């Protein structure tokens, strides 16, 4: 019986080890509530100031993104809307958010047994963010940041309530969206790159914006407002929510 029990426990541990490639901790340091979103796993969670949400991401997860929604109101059924980052009017996101939203993107256990991850401003900016491995290592396995006052300094043509749109969202087309082949930076994308050099500023900004860590031995942390305050022009208190589901 002892052998069978030990074998069962070993098998269970092996299954857990195989299933989850990384734990991702999402923390809200903003002085207002953020409704975190995560797809294709996780869904969504209300995070008051100082709260944390832990996501267990399976091996092989790809095209994954985490973002913060602001100015949300949800009812007890998890339906409502957000000023930025809304994902179809639901608390539990199954699709991507509506720009603008600062994105933490990742793909786990890809070729060469590496995790690939980045901060992207291709969908614009709404909340300052840090994305970091919990145990940094050599090469491109280190913390990355986008904490500039982008909302306050946003060009007038890109400014929207609660955030700053990427020019691809605002104007579309090959020049800004790289829809028909290679394209380079523009004066508007350089606005983002100058302030957040770690982050994607346009769709083909790969060389300076993609980071890697060893897969299976690295966990991650996403922090909204790592410095505690978003920027002087962003409201310190967002509208109260009736959402009681995910407190």
Swiss-Prot record:
<dbReference type="Pfam" id="PF00314">
    <property type="entry name" value="Thaumatin"/>
</dbReference>
<feature type="signal peptide">
    <location>
        <begin position="1"/>
        <end position="21"/>
    </location>
</feature>
<keyword id="KW-1015">Disulfide bond</keyword>
<feature type="disulfide bond">
    <location>
        <begin position="178"/>
        <end position="183"/>
    </location>
</feature>
<feature type="disulfide bond">
    <location>
        <begin position="146"/>
        <end position="196"/>
    </location>
</feature>
<dbReference type="InterPro" id="IPR017949">
    <property type="entry name" value="Thaumatin_CS"/>
</dbReference>
<dbReference type="InterPro" id="IPR037176">
    <property type="entry name" value="Osmotin/thaumatin-like_sf"/>
</dbReference>
<feature type="disulfide bond">
    <location>
        <begin position="141"/>
        <end position="213"/>
    </location>
</feature>
<dbReference type="InterPro" id="IPR001938">
    <property type="entry name" value="Thaumatin"/>
</dbReference>
<comment type="similarity">
    <text>Belongs to the thaumatin family.</text>
</comment>
<keyword id="KW-0346">Stress response</keyword>
<feature type="disulfide bond">
    <location>
        <begin position="30"/>
        <end position="225"/>
    </location>
</feature>
<feature type="disulfide bond">
    <location>
        <begin position="72"/>
        <end position="82"/>
    </location>
</feature>
<protein>
    <recommendedName>
        <fullName>Osmotin-like protein OSML81</fullName>
    </recommendedName>
</protein>
<feature type="disulfide bond">
    <location>
        <begin position="87"/>
        <end position="93"/>
    </location>
</feature>
<feature type="disulfide bond">
    <location>
        <begin position="154"/>
        <end position="164"/>
    </location>
</feature>
<feature type="disulfide bond">
    <location>
        <begin position="168"/>
        <end position="177"/>
    </location>
</feature>
<keyword id="KW-0732">Signal</keyword>
């Amino acid at each position: 019986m002892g052998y069978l029990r030990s074998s069962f426990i070993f098998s269970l541990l092996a299954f857990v080890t195989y299933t989850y490639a990384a734990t991702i901790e999402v923390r809200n340091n903003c002085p207002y509530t953020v409704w975190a979103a995560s797809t294709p796993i996780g869904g969504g969670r209300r995070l008051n100031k100082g709260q944390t949400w832990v996501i267990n991401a399976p091996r092989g997860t790809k095209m994954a993104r985490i973002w913060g929604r602001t100015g949300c109101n949800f009812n007890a059924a998890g339906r409502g809307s957000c000023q930025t980052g809304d994902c179809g009017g639901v608390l539990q996101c199954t699709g991507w958010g509506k720009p603008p939203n600062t994105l933490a993107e990742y793909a786990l256990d890809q070729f060469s047994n590496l995790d690939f991850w980045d901060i992207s401003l291709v969908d614009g900016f709404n909340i300052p963010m840090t994305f970091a491995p919990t145990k940094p290592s050599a090469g491109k396995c280190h913390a990355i940041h986008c904490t500039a006052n982008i909302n306050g300094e946003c060009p007038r043509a890109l400014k929207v309530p609660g955030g700053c749109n990427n020019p691809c969202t605002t104007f579309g087309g090959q020049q800004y969206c790289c829809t028909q082949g290679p394209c380079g930076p523009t004066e508007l994308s350089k606005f983002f790159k100058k302030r957040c050099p770690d982050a994607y500023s346009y769709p083909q900004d790969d060389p300076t914006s993609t980071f890697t860590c060893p897969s299976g031995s690295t966990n991650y942390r996403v922090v909204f407002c790592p410095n505690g305050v978003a920027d002087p022009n962003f409201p310190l208190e967002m509208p109260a929510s009736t959402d009681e589901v995910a407190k």
